[in-house]
Amino acid sequence: MTHHPKERPGYLSRRDFLARAAGTGFAISGAGSLLAACSSSTSVAQETSTTGELLGPGGLPLARPDKRVTLPLWEDPIESGLEPETGGTFTVFNYPDYLYKKLLKEFGEKYGVDVQYTAFDNITSGIKRLASGAVQPDVMEMTPDNLDQAVAGKLIKPLNLDYIPNLQKNIWPELADPFYDGGSHYTVPYTLYATGIAWRTDHVTEDIPSMEQPWDIFWQAEAYKGKTALLSEPRETIAMALLRKGHLDINTEDPALINQAVADLKELYDICNIKVGDIQYQSVPEGTSWLNQAWAGDMIAGYIYYLPKGTPATALAYWKADKGKVPVQNDCFSICATTKKPVLSHLFLNYLLDNGVAYSNFVNFNGYQPPLNEIEPESLVKDGVVPENLANSVLTKDDFGPDSSQEMTLTATGQQLWEDGYSDFLAGGGG
């Protein structure tokens, strides 16, 4: 996941990105030391179980949309019926400005606590800071592909769902009991996103949705040289190249497939002087980029925040593939093992899943959709939240399920393969 539209960083040069990757430890090679700091009993060297099942860096089975995983409880959840803790501070650990501060203030006032917001640069660095003891938050943003390490390292606490009735009441069944956390032992869902293509209709002449393979547009973008960009995310970028060639397993650890995807991506430097970055929510609406790989929420946020006055909403367009061919994902929230307010932490998770709170966070602040039963594309268009031409940016529960395509945890070897491939792509443009 990425930052709130008003806070995300600008385009990175390939050299800058490589430096950042080295500094923040994107590669999982450091996972062993991370987990060792959390639990001396945790081993991460083994990549297969005694039955031959693939294991993630945390030593737990790899979850997939068609392979449900129930995570082990490393301690019992808190008892039911306890009163919430009051007074002092309550710390939320998250991406910068990814949660509406007004809502945090209202929660604090309701329960008599001072809510503090501590930010991390990315989820990898956030988990490392938590493991080292550098921060001691109550709750934190979590992603399904990092859940393996957080649970194995005993960094997050098991949940007592008696305190979180909004999970079953308001949330899509597909995410109220997700495949990556069967029984919702450690997480509740927060926001959703899909990966597709955003473009300016007043500059890009092709009918992208009608193309036999819409991803081909990047390899046909000579006319948009210097105005074309991909996400600066290893998994997203390589997955796009895989999908373009019809390879639907975006969690593959086949070196031949990864190497071919990287070779294909390198072609884009000569074709369209491809850029990498995460400001498509701004650059496409403002017209400084005409063609971009993008998350679904980007164009909604861009329409709200960055479309210049007088520019019609129809200048923006977004495409995503059909289910099973479009990468979809969700962010989560978890309770940190460091919390001194476990009851209040449960109530905070329930608060995030309140219909009014989640909707306000979406339409008044970050532009990323929560998985609420009550949200439908038609209603958002009718209410003027989303223009009709961007209605396909809104996800439905039908986009998720066993036949969906989601970037999930890889083995440590697989993660290194993807990271090395992406570094090769970045270096391939001449540095």
Where are these regions (language model features)?
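Conserved C-terminal helix/tail region of periplasmic/extracytoplasmic solute-binding proteins
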Residues: 397-431
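Short beta-strand->loop
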Residues: 157-167, 187, 309-327, 336-338
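N-terminal secretory signal peptides
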Residues: 1-16, 25-32, 36-37
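Mature extracytoplasmic/periplasmic domains
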Residues: 331, 335-403
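A structural signal for short loop-to-beta-strand junctions that line the ligand-binding cleft
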Residues: 131, 135-142, 157-160, 166-199, ...
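Early extracytoplasmic/lumenal segment of secretory-pathway proteins
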Residues: 66-149
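Bacterial lipoprotein signal-peptidase II cleavage site
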Residues: 39-46
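Ligand-binding pocket segment of bilobal, Venus flytrap-like solute-binding proteins
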Residues: 148, 229-237, 241, 248-317
